[in-house]
Amino acid sequence: MNLSKLKFGSTIGIIGGGQLGKMMAQSAQQMGYKVIVLDPNSSCPCQYVANEFINAAYDDQIALDRLGALSDVITYEFENISANQLQALASKYNIPQGYQAIQLLQDRLTEKQTLQDSGSNIAPFLQLTDYDDLVKAVDSIGYPFIVKTRFGGYDGKGQVLVKDATHLDEARQLIQAQECVAEQYLNLSKEVSLTVTIGTNNQITYFPLQENEHQNQILFKTIVPARVQDNKEQEARNEVNKIIKAIHFIGTFTVEFFIDQQNQLYVNEIAPRPHNSGHYSIEACEYSQFDTHIKAITGQQLPQQVTLLKPAIMMNLLGRDLDLLEDQFAEHPEWHVHIYGKNERKFNRKMGHLTVLTNDINETEQKLLKQFEGR
């Protein structure tokens, strides 16, 4: 795909008004574009920065057509919009990202099958339609393994870790609700991710490899550059190069990886949009993941590479972290704090993030962990 550059003053439509949509909008407006956002939540974070806001459900075809008619280009902040509706929208309006990636990645089974067919290194998996398949997973994959719903689920939702036979009943209940996928549980040494942007002229921009730590299946912190062997970044790029031959991408997306105790790299999953682990790039790189996303979908030239200006640590701020830390923000000028503007503070809800640039990652990490003690 090779589209002409979208002129400044043109309008970018965003489906989804959460924090990702908000940060996309801010990058777009900085480049001189207007932004119109569609979201069912009348007080979503993006509502406060959008030039125009459409308060409607994601499956409201009249509202989607209005968004399309008012926009010169359309993007989305998340992958849970109906692929069929996105396909219908793409047939009438300019959606450089298309619908194919969403169609593949909404279903964990087709995601795994596509990755397998691409030659990517992934953990063994099995489709689960009933309890008999669960028994087969015990035989073919062996304990421990993870059962995940095929559709939906994020931040650890829709998953059961099956360590032994005592967890089979919990997994059976998940399968009764919807079809699932079982995948081998890996003994991990690290989790990393690679954020990538692809332009409409097939340019590829890689961000630095990101080291991630999760707590209760929610991203806790990201450290850049990742503290791994030097060859791991190139290995990750090689895996991404396999993936982009199999899946159509325009804009920013992120591939999450596991590194096991034998130092083997495995593709875990793909997010076809800007990702939580890339938020550090707002301060730590000359272009953020949102900047390159907007450049890509508007037909602009992408940088050949994104340079890390300084090592960085990004910490997510959940509702409980704001309860603990909000009085500390004014005392730490080195903290770049982003509060998303969600109207309801919940214990485990992502309410914001903070980024610290540092020449000593280990020392800064320890200082931050002390601040987050008791969370």
Swiss-Prot record:
Amino acids binding ATP: 108, 148, 153-159, 183-186, 191, 214, 268-269
Signal peptide extent: none
Domain ATP-grasp residue range list: 112-298
Pfam families: ATP-grasp, PurK_C, RS_preATP-grasp-like
EC supergroup of this enzyme: ligase
GO CC terms of this entry: cytosol
Recorded superkingdom: Bacteria
Record InterPro entries: ATP-grasp, ATP-grasp_carboxylate-amine, ATP_grasp_subdomain_1, PreATP-grasp_dom_sf, PurK, PurK_C, PurT/PurK_preATP-grasp, Rudment_hybrid_motif
The keyword Ligase belongs to this UniProt entry's keyword annotation: yes
GO MF annotation terms: 5-(carboxyamino)imidazole ribonucleotide synthase activity; ATP binding; metal ion binding; phosphoribosylaminoimidazole carboxylase activity
Family as reported in the entry's similarity comment: Belongs to the PurK/PurT family.
Protein purpose: Catalyzes the ATP-dependent conversion of 5-aminoimidazole ribonucleotide (AIR) and HCO(3)(-) to N5-carboxyaminoimidazole ribonucleotide (N5-CAIR).
Subunit description: Homodimer.
Protein's recorded name: N5-carboxyaminoimidazole ribonucleotide synthase
Organism name: Staphylococcus saprophyticus subsp. saprophyticus (strain ATCC 15305 / DSM 20229 / NCIMB 8711 / NCTC 7292 / S-41)
Lineage: Bacteria, Bacillati, Bacillota, Bacilli, Bacillales
Name of the gene encoding the protein in the UniProt record: purK
